[in-house]
Amino acid sequence: QYFPIKTGFMKTTPLKAVDGVSFSIKPGETTTVDLVMRESKDDIQVIGNFNSESTYKPMDSDELKSILATTGRGYYIVAVLGAGQEPTNHALRDIAALGKDFDEWGRGIVLLFPNEEQYKKFRPQEFPGLPATITYGIDVDGSIQKQIAEGMKLSNKTILPMFIIGDTFNRVVFVSQGYTIGLGEQLMKVIHKL
């Protein structure tokens, strides 16, 4: 009797990258089979999930609003920032440097702060060129930060900033946490493959 093993990963397209092998097991013996996981260097891969119905408090409203209601259907960027912290400042400078590219992409970017005090420390004028598609808000109870950390299996749940590119099918195709060199370029590289 033969047994199949199938391995692979889900892509953002209907195609899936799958490998398979069949093997047999003889009574009283141990059978060792190599487990081969395909990896694509070029394709965008689904690396986790994030609920696009998650809510936050927009800075221009007292009502909670979902990421989906803010960005519409399709891909979006969500980040939880630490205002005045160098890793966040560096990330925002990287994004501002490519602000026109993000504006051309035209998708929503939701930048969240852990609380009102953090938002009050934020000085957008220090980052000229930030995309016009940004919506600022508060991660009211820390649920979005927690969801990103858990959904992406981040080893440290408190290091900011946290960035994801996700879609409204709740798939995540990019994650970054903490100090990252060239974050704007990394985001655009993924965006161009979507």
What residues fall within each predicted segment?
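A short tyrosine-centered beta-strand micro-motif
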Residues: 1-4, 170
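Structured interaction patches on ligand/partner-binding surfaces of diverse proteins
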Residues: 3-34
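Pro/Ala/Gly-rich low-complexity, hydrophilic intrinsically disordered segments
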Residues: 24-64, 186-192
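Thiol-/selenol-based redox modules, centered on thioredoxin-like
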Residues: 37-45, 159-194
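A short beta-strand-turn-helix
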Residues: 50-76, 93-97
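Short acidic-hydrophobic, aromatic-tinged amphipathic segments that line or gate anion-handling sites
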Residues: 58-60, 133-143
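Structural microenvironment flanking redox-active thiols in thiol-disulfide oxidoreductases
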Residues: 74-76, 83-130, 142-147
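Structural micro-motif
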Residues: 131-135, 150-164
